[in-house]
């Protein structure tokens, strides 16, 4: 599961972009590429973009002008930037890192079930290359140690700071939805901010979002819906998030907009 990959993939699906997806193991990509964020490769223009935000602006410049009718208007509205959306960009980028560190505190705890992390990393996903899956399974103890060190998971104060960071963003999202009448975070139409927010928080709602993640492409994620080893803290957080307006908004967005493109 890659938050930023889902953001880009979801936007491309809404825009009906004709693309081919190549999946890599979540942790092995650090070794192969030096990073885990998605790449957008346009062979026609020989372009390679390694940042999900910049990939969206590329699509805005190259793909949206080729769209027709209502879909073109929706596509332009989806990717249009404003002072408000750019302010959200900064908050959501911080949110992504905070969520990762906070969740890994439990998923990579000393007594954590390796099956959870391996599924989140794609270690049991048939669409991920076999060698990547084998590397993740065989190298799990080493990867776990490296991730614990990289995210400073022994630092209790940092763990609390991460939690406070993303709860503050959730409060902002609840307030924005109330201000906008419950439609979307930044206005009447869907924005890339809405997609980013939902993609970042979706993995923390596994009981409802996992079947809809990536439009249901990854069969190995299914056991995460009701995994017997899911940490209690993550289960409790999901329950609390589902009671929030922003949590209900995330579920609504996945149900209504994850499996269809804009209508032309």
Task: Identify the meaning behind each predicted range.
Residues 199-261:
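Short His-centered aromatic/hydrophobic patch
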Residues 3, 27, 138, 142, ...:
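Cysteine-nucleophile amide-bond enzymes
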Residues 13, 90, 171-175, 251:
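Surface-exposed alpha-helical segments enriched in charged/polar residues
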Residues 1-133:
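GST-like domain detector, emphasizing the conserved glutathione-binding G-site
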Residues 96-216:
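GST-like fold's C-terminal all-alpha helical module
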Residues 3-10, 50-53, 57, 83, ...:
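A structural signal for well-ordered alpha-helical segments within the folded catalytic domains
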């Amino acid at each position: 599961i890659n938050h930023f990959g889902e953001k880009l993939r979801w936007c491309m699906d809404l825009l009906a972009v004709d693309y081919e997806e190549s999946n890599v193991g979540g942790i092995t990509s650090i070794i192969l590429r030096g990073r885990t964020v998605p790449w957008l490769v346009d062979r026609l223009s020989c372009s390679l973009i390694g940042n999900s935000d910049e990939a969206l602006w590329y699509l805005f410049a190259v793909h949206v002008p080729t769209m027709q009718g209502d879909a073109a208007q929706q596509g332009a509205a989806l990717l249009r930037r404003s002072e408000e959306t750019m302010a959200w960009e900064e908050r959501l980028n911080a949110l992504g890192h905070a969520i990762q560190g906070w969740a890994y505190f439990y998923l990579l705890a000393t007594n954590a079930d390796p099956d959870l992390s391996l599924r989140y990393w794609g270690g049991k996903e048939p669409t991920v290359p076999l060698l990547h899956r084998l590397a993740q399974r065989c190298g799990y103890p080493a990867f776990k140690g490296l991730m614990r060190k990289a995210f400073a998971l022994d630092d209790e104060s940092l763990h609390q700071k991460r939690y406070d960071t993303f709860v503050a963003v959730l409060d902002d999202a609840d307030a924005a939805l109330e201000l906008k009448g419950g439609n979307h975070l930044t206005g009447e139409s869907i924005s890339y901010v809405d997609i980013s927010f939902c993609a970042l928080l979706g993995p923390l709602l596994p009981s409802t979002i996992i079947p809809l993640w990536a439009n249901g492409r990854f069969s190995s994620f299914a056991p995460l819906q009701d995994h017997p080893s899911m940490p209690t803290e993550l289960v409790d957080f999901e329950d609390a998030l589902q009671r929030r307006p922003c949590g209900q908004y995330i579920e609504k967005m996945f149900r209504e907009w994850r499996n269809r493109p804009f209508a032309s």
